């Protein structure tokens, strides 16, 4: 089996622009990618592909096969799937809370397709046992789309429900979850820039100062 990680560095995570500069965000996504790759390897996956619009965006310390493709996310992933005959795990690069035990549980399932839903109807992880005929449809309510695609092909579906695996880091409040529950270098990076602000409501992040830190 193989894992594939779609990855974009340039001007990434624009919804974090209220709390991070562009350079900080680009560094942050690099560290999240490193965490995801490390987790995959810890979970027993050795064959890892990273699909990116610019191969130069992936640092040399990322031990994975780099595929450069500047087409739409769905187009490049569907092309990738059409060329594979082994089980494929598609995992997003902004999931530093995923643990190796999640990966082990996901790939151990017997269903044809295992889906890890993300916030707001998204899809964070897809495990497809027979990828050559499966086509993905990200954006919008992709969780529902992928369930429908699997059902139309008479494929068995497993929904893997996990708070940590479902928490992608897109918005400032997500960084709170990373600081509270994380375990890797992305958490370390966030902790150097934010503290926890507690009150009567939910815990929030609070920048240590307003001067950009690199």
Swiss-Prot record:
Known EC number: 2.7.7.68
GO molecular function, one term: phospholactate guanylyltransferase activity
A biological process from GO: F420-0 metabolic process
Signal peptide: none
Pathway this chain belongs to: Cofactor biosynthesis; coenzyme F420 biosynthesis
InterPro entries named in the record: CofC, Nucleotide-diphossugar_trans
A family per Pfam: CofC
Reaction catalyzed: (2S)-2-phospholactate + GTP + H(+) = (2S)-lactyl-2-diphospho-5'-guanosine + diphosphate
Record family assignment: Belongs to the CofC family.
Protein purpose: Guanylyltransferase that catalyzes the activation of (2S)-2-phospholactate (2-PL) as (2S)-lactyl-2-diphospho-5'-guanosine, via the condensation of 2-PL with GTP. It is involved in the biosynthesis of coenzyme F420, a hydride carrier cofactor.
NCBIfam families for this protein: F420_cofC (TIGR03552)
Subunit structure: Homodimer.
Protein name: 2-phospho-L-lactate guanylyltransferase
Gene that encodes it: cofC
């Amino acid at each position: 089996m193989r894992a594939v990680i779609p990855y974009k560095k340039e001007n990434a995570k624009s919804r974090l622009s209220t709390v991070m500069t562009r350079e900080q965000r680009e560094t942050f996504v690099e560290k999240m990618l490193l965490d995801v790759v490390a987790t995959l390897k810890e979970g027993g996956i050795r064959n890892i592909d990273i699909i990116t619009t610019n191969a130069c965006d992936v640092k040399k310390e990322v031990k994975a096969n780099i595929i450069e493709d500047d087409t739409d996310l769905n187009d490049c992933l569907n092309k990738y799937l059409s060329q594979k005959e082994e089980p494929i795990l598609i995992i997003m690069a902004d999931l530093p809370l995923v643990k190796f035990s999640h990966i082990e549980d996901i790939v151990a399932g017997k269903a044809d397709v295992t889906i890890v839903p993300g916030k707001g109807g998204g899809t964070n992880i897809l495990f497809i046992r027979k990828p050559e005929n499966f086509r993905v449809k990200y954006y919008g309510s992709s969780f529902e789309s992928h369930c429908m695609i699997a059902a139309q092909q008479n494929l068995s579906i497993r929904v893997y429900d996990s708070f940590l695996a479902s928490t992608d880091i897109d918005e400032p409040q997500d960084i709170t979850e990373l600081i509270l529950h994380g375990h890797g270098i992305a958490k370390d990076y966030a902790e150097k820039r934010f503290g926890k602000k507690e009150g009567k409501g939910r815990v929030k992040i609070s920048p240590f100062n307003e001067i950009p830190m690199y």
